[in-house]
Regions:
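N-terminal, positively charged/glycine-rich alpha-helical extensions of SAM-dependent methyltransferases
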Residues: 1-23
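Conserved alpha-helix/loop element of class I SAM-dependent methyltransferases that forms part
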Residues: 33-50
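C-terminal alpha-helical "lid/dimerization" subdomain adjacent to the S-adenosyl-L-methionine
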Residues: 5-10, 152-201
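Class I SAM-dependent methyltransferase SAM/SAH-binding core
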Residues: 55-57, 61-111
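Short conserved loop adjoining the S-adenosyl-L-methionine
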Residues: 112-116
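A conserved beta-strand element that flanks and buttresses the S-adenosyl-L-methionine
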Residues: 123
Length: 203
């Protein structure tokens, strides 16, 4: 895909778009205590899977994929995001960490995954709640999994705490994931922990 492509065609109608300001903001969200605990939850769970190739859908500034790469060496990873600004920041961070020989970032989306490679693990962290056509996206992603591989979604749930009141539209629930998996005729392995949720779909 052309590196000059602006990614505008990869957003579905109504999906939130992230430019230079948004990408800078997301670069500091890892400092927020709730999100630090969320990232720890994701890292622990990802470590339970066996994989040699990983795709991060909605990789943003690359924090999660690069964190995984920093703790595990024997895999190659690709992060995709429809925001060129996010991809640029992630690529720069990968190069500074010396991980760009095995971790790459490209413009793409859940419905438009660049290349033709399949993956041992595909995951999304704090991106799924933005997707407007979730079922189409899951179908597209499942097609890019190797046999026996997993697509894993990590999100935040409503744990009743005060701060959740301000981000209702960004929250997922067990019921939402169960409804989606039922419509797609897929089995979802759902795990909840301290206000965070993981839904895993196996090919």
């Amino acid at each position: 895909m052309d590196s000059d492509y602006n990614g505008s065609g990869l957003y579905a109608e109504g999906e939130e778009r992230f430019g230079s300001i948004g990408s800078r903001f997301y670069g500091i969200t890892r400092l927020i205590p709730t999100l630090r605990r969320f990232y720890s939850f994701v890292l622990r769970d990802v470590a339970s899977y066996d994989y040699g190739s990983v795709l991060d859908v909605g990789s943003g500034t690359g924090f999660m994929l690069l964190s995984i790469a920093g703790s595990r060496e024997n895999f190659r990873g690709l992060g995709i995001d429809p925001s060129p600004q996010m991809v640029a920041r992630a690529t720069s961070r990968s190069m500074k960490l010396g991980l760009n020989d095995r971790i790459a970032f490209r413009i793409g989306s859940s419905r438009s995954i660049p290349g033709n490679s399949n993956f041992d693990l595909i995951y999304s962290s704090l991106s799924f709640h933005h997707w407007k056509d979730r079922e189409e996206s899951i179908r597209s992603i499942m097609d890019r999994l190797n046999a026996g591989a997993h697509f894993v979604i990590y999100e935040i749930t409503d744990d009743g705490s005060f701060n959740r009141k301000f981000v209702k539209s960004h929250l997922m629930s067990r019921q939402k994931f169960e409804d989606i998996s039922s419509r797609l005729n897929l089995q979802a392995d759902i795990k909840e922990e301290n206000g965070y949720i993981r839904a895993a779909f196996k090919k």
